[in-house]
Amino acid sequence: MLNDKIKELITPTAKTLGYKVINVSFIVKPAILKIVIDRFDEKKVNVLDCQVFSKAISAVLDVENIIPGKYFLEVESAGIERSLMDLEDFIKFLGYTIQVKLVAAINENKKYIGVISNIKGQEITLNLQNDSTIAIDYDNIKVAKIVFTDEMFRQITKNY
């Protein structure tokens, strides 16, 4: 798949620059290559980061000519309600509220919202809103993302 090839191609350059490629998606019409990045140093991605990354990746993509014809390159941060793409992301966001959609239902549900309270191997434990917990195998997670909460809002706005 083209998205996977692009991610594989640009990941070494991203790592050298201190970035992690979160997601790559190529839209054929209009031709747009969208790349979502994060920083390894835990700082927030800013406009300058996107500009630096874009210039470096453009050079790599142009040399490899992996995308035929002209296209628009869009680089952005993962954002507040970012997707969790790998087990490393779950570890990084321990204590955060997330929404998960599962491949196979647990207790007849395929969707849960809860706080990541523990990670042991491939097992992720969520504290659910009804004060119960659920253990989910990482391989059973289809999609996961951070949920923007009132507490996050208070943290962001406390210095304003």
UniProtKB/Swiss-Prot annotation:
It comes from Orientia tsutsugamushi (strain Boryong). Transmembrane segments: none annotated. It comes from the Bacteria. Its main location: cytoplasm. Required for maturation of 30S ribosomal subunits. This is Ribosome maturation factor RimP. One of its GO terms (biological process) is ribosomal small subunit assembly. GO terms for cellular component: cytosol. Belongs to the RimP family. It is found in: Cytoplasm. Keywords: Cytoplasm, Ribosome biogenesis. The gene is rimP. The keyword Cell division does not apply.
